[in-house]
């Protein structure tokens, strides 16, 4: 009997030691990954001169060279420029966007979870803000600024009310998906504003569905791997999945590679997406991600 007890005690001691070693190993590797990835800051400022673009905005018609210059000066594509330069308020916004692109921002990393960081503008408690192009309901925002250990996962959100600046997003473990202000992207070190190539009526339906059915979902990054990617009654989601799920309800698959986990990067490369604006990422590159 004593021999059996000794064997059991020995087993649990060995098991506990191995388990503790694995936990320490996991935490160490995870933290090393977080420190390593945190050094690769994704924030870019133009390495060329700022020029006066106001005269261009007054032209009746713009050439391709004009649009290219405006893109390099603002990060806004033809799609976004044409959407804003129709009125004086839009022209003013374009000039404000240019000022933000060339502004001398400071940046910091905010740790908000286990091995999880975001890259932000300004300082903790004294954030700085960039300027977004005119939002349209159904737009998608993506950013490379969110890191999980070795993985630059990024973040994304669905614009559910362009005029009000309201977005639907799933932020982190322990939280549920919620409607928030788009200003959460204004403080990120970078973002890309995408516009799905579907008609306005469809995008309004997508936004309405999202508001009624995708708010309050528990955050779970394993959706699509440990559980089905598409469920009629969705209970769990994450930042990329929740945007994908809203469009998928109407037969539009914005996941470019069809994998289990839908990432912001997958949506950036979707054939359905057009770029409206880029901030904080190198405008000299054809592929921003």
Predicted regions span which residues?
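Short N-terminal edge-element motif at the start of the domain
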Residues: 106-150
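Short, solvent-exposed coil/turn linker segments
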Residues: 63, 77-80, 131, 175-184, ...
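Glycine-rich catalytic cores of cysteine/serine-nucleophile enzymes that process amide/ester linkages
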Residues: 135-197, 224-231
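Active-site nucleophile-His-acid catalytic modules used for acyl/amide transfer and hydrolysis
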Residues: 194-257
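Short, intrinsically disordered/low-complexity patches at protein termini
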Residues: 191-193, 201, 277-279
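Activation targets extended, charge/polar-rich intrinsically disordered C-terminal tails
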Residues: 2-18, 23-114, 233-289
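Short amphipathic alpha-helical segments, especially helix-boundary/capping motifs
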Residues: 115, 131-132, 182-185, 216-221
